Amino acid sequence: MMNFEGCPSDASFGPFVKGCRGDFDFTLKFELIIFFIAPSCVFTALTFVRIFVLVSKSRIMTGNRIPLNLIKNVYSPIQIRENCFSSSQVLGLVAGMTTAALSYYEHWYSRRPSMLLSIYLFLSLLLDIAHDRTLWLNAYSTLEYGFSSVFSAAVAIKAFAVWLESRPLSKLPWGDSHVKETPDSTSGVYSLSSFMWLRGLLRLGYRKVLALSDLPALHGNMLGVVYDRFRKCSVNHFTRAEQSQERGKYKLVHALSTTLTLHLLLPVLPRIALIGLSLAQAFLTQAVLRYLEEDQPHSYSWGLIGATVLIYGGISICTSLYWYFHERLLCLVRGCLASAIFHKTLELSLTSNARSASVTLMSTDIDRIHKGFLNLHELWANIVEAGLAAWFLWRQVGIAFIAPIGLVLLSFLGVSIVGNYVGLYQKAWMGKIQNRVAITANVISNIKHLKVSGMTRPVESIIQNTRESELRASRGTRRLQIASLIIAFAPDLTAPGIMLAATKSQDFSSHKVYTAIALLTLLTVPLGSIFRSVSPLMSAFACLERIQAFLELDTRKDPRLITHSTPDTSSASGDEKVYADPLPMSRSSAVKVIQASFGWQGKEQACLKNINLTVNYSALTAIIGPVGSGKSTLCKALLGETPFSAGKVVLERDASCKVGYCDQTPFIRNCSIKENIVGFSKWNPVRYLEVVEASMLSYDLRELPEGDATIVGSGGMTLSGGQKQRIAIARSLYLDTRLLILDDILSGLDTQTEHHLFQHVLSPNGLLKKRENAPAIVFSTHSVKYARWADHIFLLNEKGEMIEQGSWEELSTYQSHLQSLCIQEKVQMTDLKQLEPVESEQPLDVTMSEIEQTRSSRRGADNQETIASGADSSARQNGDLGVYRHYFRAVPPVAIISFVTSSLSYGFLYSFPNIWLKWWLLDADSTRPHHPKAFWNGIYAMFQILALLSELLTMYLALTYFALISGATVHSSALRAITRAPLYFFASVDLGTITNYFSQDMTLVDGALPASLIQFASDVAASLGMAGNLAASSPYLAASYPLCFFLLYFVTKYYLRTSRQLRLLDLEAKSPLYAHFLELENGIATIRAADWTGEYLVQSRLLLDVSQRPAYLLAMVQRWLLFILNTFVSLLALFTVALVTQLNNHGTGFAGAGLISLMQIGQFLTNVVRSYATLEVSMGAVSRLKALTESPHRECIEGQEVVPPQEWPCRGSIKIDGVSASYDSQNDQVNEKSFSLRELNLHIEAGQKVAICGRTGSGKSSIILLLLHMLRPLRNTREDAITIDGISIQNVDPPILRERIFAVPQDTIFLPQGSSWLENMEPFATNAAECRSVLEDVNLWDVVIAQGGDLTAALDSDTLSQGQRQLFGLARAVLRKRAKAQSMSEPAPQGGLLLLDEPSSAVDFETEGLMHRVIQREFCEYTVIMVTHRLEFITQIHSVGQVSVDTQQGLFDRVLVVDAGTIVEDGHPAQLLESKEGKFRALWEASRV
């Protein structure tokens, strides 16, 4: 046992000794209690809690950890023998045993080294080192020296144990190296606090261009387990609130906090430690100044140096741990919210306008939530820190502390007033963003039809006007943001002058003033942080309210009843109501509709009324009716998708599980053809080849260079309409289902393909009837040509009422409506078996290995294209100053110079008052002051007020000037680049990628960029000023600045090479996720019918986790840089304190100014890192937008566009000489297989009416696209190879070309939901009366009346049938023609060019006659080129109830038959019909069936 006779004070608690050891040590009793007993008690208690948590988990580790436990057990008895008190001996033994036990359980049940054990061992090691020093200083006898030596050995063993405990388990010699985890999930507290686990990623990013595959996966806790738990919590909170009829705004916040409680609490402990360490900075300043002013032992200086190391080193470590845990929390918040939004999107009804909001909520709103929650823990921590600082300040300056506190209270009042309005303005702004993104996404997804329609420039103008309206709506939020920031800066800038003015002269000593300034800094800086956080936090809560409102929307209510013989409901999905035999249904019945009515806008406006229908297994049920009769509505009603219904729809259980559904508009995913067909079904090669043959795709797959591995582009951009339709048919055939619903699937197909499909799929001898469990088939159509072979026929009239139903035999026994339709359409009653057999397609002979090989090579090419997109490899690593020029190009140079000047002025005016205070104190300490206090105080306050005004100017320029001007310019450039991009660009670039430019990228440009620019510029300027103050405190420190700047430059360069790439990967990785959302929005009915919602949810989780990886790692790399800078500040603090205490030749004035600057520069460097991190992410968005704007993908060389005369084309003559073209990019080495047109030669005289026909995929629509400069010829084509009225179209400005040529696409494009009828026609409208006249001509005025009564009513395009959509497209063309005629100031030829791409593919016989009459009447003097599969009107004119048999009186005087991109027949239809072996004759005879 040690004796205390050498130092009597060792027997007391102390804590400091007196009269021995230089009066610079703790007493032994204090060390035993504080260094041994207290830590052992706390550690033992926490150990039992930790072991209890660990044993509840499953074992994850194998291997042997006996060596580590032996080391700790060896250390324990060595440790406790020196203790002189029995309590310390017992607790030391218990701590040693619990250390071994905890190490054992952590090894078996935890992936990472024990944090609790690592912290305890490290802290106890530091305390043991201090105690070891005491033992050696107190040793006098041989026994005591021996004991001290043994304890030193014990300290060395503990140091080794600390090193072992910090190692990842897989790297220990006895660990399990087979466990593969992410670096941070296996790292100990030392690696986490220093971010050493990132060193591999940083090295990799410095050496090479990073790809997503180079990034480690996220920790398992960030995956689906947390998301599922959040979903359950949110459902429970919303359900309880609904049951209690509460309308709380924070239900989503409660659900998040409940789900992430542990992650929410983890940052608390290091943040509390930061509070204590921050306050310790002020007391360190006071202690150093007292040491310089008073005569104290030199040993105290070493204590101050040690305290500096502990305080600033502790700040670095605690800051790192705090941000590590907090960034993980933010990552999980984003994942939970995005997952919930996607899940809710799956549940919304087809008519919900909120589906288009999902992308905005997931991008813009979640980003603002992330920004607002970034300082979530800072709120309470800053309040605590400010409260403690205020108390210490009161003790330091007395009553003078009331002055800054009054200013703080006024600031609180101002922030409260501002905060009340932030949410209101923020919601209005977000609504504008949501509207713009919805319009943009709708336009991009329909860009092909938009270009064909000639609406590019009008729609571009509409979107840009929407953008400018959005920027105007942001002004209110920006002004509030400026007010909030100024209020936040005010206390920090003006409080010191107010406090010094209230301070008594007798309290004006250096150490008191500088200590008060330090405490005031600890008061105002946290409060300023709170004030700056209020606006983003209120914005975050406003966005959370928007997401909560989205999640609380009514879900799709499936009114269908599922029947089966037992009450088992396990297979029922969604909201379907399940009953055990609610109605008598025979085993052969799949669906029964009983006295049902269906509608989209309310039960009083039902589209279908009093429907009774039975659909049987192994039977084909044909639903026949004219345009707008409700055929598509009935199909969707059988799927449970109609929002309003009455009566009953009963499904047999087998028919309800999976339903094969083909919509009129095919749902095509942006993947390979094979993946589109197979979907999420199990792979069956026999079934796959079977459905490919049946859907007549084998020929197309042989013609495509990559076969079924061909990527089809967003919405099937590279495919023809018929190919898309047949892929959708093949998908429904491949699906293992007992019910198929086919909505007018044969429209848009050529006659031969149509017959082939019906014969091989739907006929009595077709594929479906031959299957073992033949499904029930519902087939809607406007034609009666296949009614004879239907098992059940269901006829509808134009009012949505059933006329008659029954089998063919039943309906043909009397004068039925069916027979009148057959007579009207002149349908031959020929049996299918009597038709000439369709040429057998060559079987698809492609092995799966070839397909996979092709697909893998395609992926490699895509990856290379992705890497090259946005910026080249060098720019991704080293940056591009051109990005800043691109952003500021629209800003006047005077504004930029003013911004830089105001920022630098702020930096000088903020830092110089510390030097002024030093001069003031020197003058005050002199016996005869040169100036009164008012002089010094007034100038001091003047500097601070000028600094505030400089910052106000900086904010105004960035937020209201740069943001509005540059935001509009950058958007306009990007939008122009997209609308003028060639068609192949949209086939190769995903829809989600393009949408991401206008959602997340544009959001960063609007919000994060100007705010981070202000913060970065101000903090850099202030940091430079503080560095000057530090240099003034010690010339030796100033001498080290060149080395410091060199090190900072190297660290920053090392950091930027990785962070730049991560920021681009962060933006790029979200594009597939956005594309997935948009894909879901377009195909939700098909996905729900096939019961693929679970698979889509899993896929969304995978895409979400992939998108999280670069964002999470970018945040961590930014925190690594913060740790390096904090370490740098720690070294500066160490050198500063060491120099001023050891040399002691600078006086307290400069030392105090230097220490105050040291406190402030740490905070400024933290803000610099934070603001630069946001700035570089925002500039990454600008970089992507710049790359898009400067993309080489252009329809015409910028600046070389030719604008033809206003009246062009006035005749419509066309000349095409030897042109070959491909959908691929302009490449002379294009595979000939990919040619869409081959050596095309075509001359069309003015005024000719030309019909183009041929099998689907033969190149008919390609001719239309060629004339519209959307399909460009090969590069070696002559410039005058394509002319219209003698002018080559290759250099004509493409948007102008498409405006001058009137074209009607197969699929009509509409503006987003909510736009009026007039707005949808307004780009070409002359007046409302003209619009009404045109709509009446095409029989759409009754639809207008039904939807609201006039042209200002909202046009609900979802309720329009495909035929009505095509009528609207024709109405637009008529309106354009009339507008052109009225715009001519002088008489001019009234001719022109009209292109129609299957304009009547989805209409019935009578409506088609109407459309042809309108075309003949309105465009009689025009050259008309029509692509059509329906040949009845090529050779004869039909009128209602009357047929002309004179084939010489046909609408068209010329027919082109196209096959494989080549014109194989050309002539008058009558002449071509005379050729019995001709292609046109074969097509025409097939159409007569």
From Swiss-Prot:
Keyword Chloroplast attributed? no
Q: Which residues bind ATP?
A: 625-632, 1254-1261
Region described as Disordered: 852-874
Mutagenesis or variant effect for D743K: Does not rescue the FUM19 deletion phenotype of increased FB1 expression
Keywords recorded for this protein, A-Z: ATP-binding, Cell membrane, Glycoprotein, Hydrolase, Membrane, Nucleotide-binding, Phosphoprotein, Repeat, Transmembrane, Transmembrane helix, Transport
Transmembrane region(s) = 33-53, 84-104, 116-136, 143-163, 264-284, 302-322, 373-393, 397-417, 482-502, 511-531, 890-910, 945-965, 977-999, 1031-1051, 1120-1140, 1149-1169
Recorded consequence of changing D1397K: Does not rescue the FUM19 deletion phenotype of increased FB1 expression
State the superkingdom: Eukaryota
The ABC transporter domain sits at: 591-823, 1214-1485
Effect seen on changing K631V: Does not rescue the FUM19 deletion phenotype of increased FB1 expression
Localization in the cell = Cell membrane
Residues annotated as glycosylated are: N612, N616, N670
Coiled coil stretches, renumbered: none
**InterPro entries in the cross-refs:** AAA+_ATPase, ABC1_TM_dom, ABC1_TM_sf, ABC_transporter-like_ATP-bd, ABC_transporter-like_CS, ABC_transporter_C-like, ABCC_6TM_D1, ABCC_6TM_D2
In the UniProt record for this chain, what is stated about the effect of gene disruption?
Answer: Does not affect the production of fumonisins B1 and B2, but strongly decreases the production of fumonisin B3. Causes overproduction of fumonisin B1 in the mycelium and supernatant. Increases the expression of FUM8, FUM17 and FUM18.
Which residues does the UniProt record annotate as the domain ABC transmembrane type-1?
272-539, 902-1187
Q: What induces it?
A: Expression is strongly reduced by benomyl. Induced by exogenous fumonisin B1.
Q: Which Gene Ontology cellular component annotation is one that this UniProt entry carries?
A: plasma membrane
Tell me the GO molecular function terms.
ABC-type transporter activity; ATP binding; ATP hydrolysis activity
Bilayer topology reads:
Multi-pass membrane protein
Job of this protein: ABC transporter that may provide the dual role of fumonisin export and self-protection by allowing the fungus to evade the harmful effect of its own fumonisin production. Plays a role in the repression of the gene cluster that mediates fumonisin biosynthesis.
Name used for this protein in its record: ABC transporter FUM19
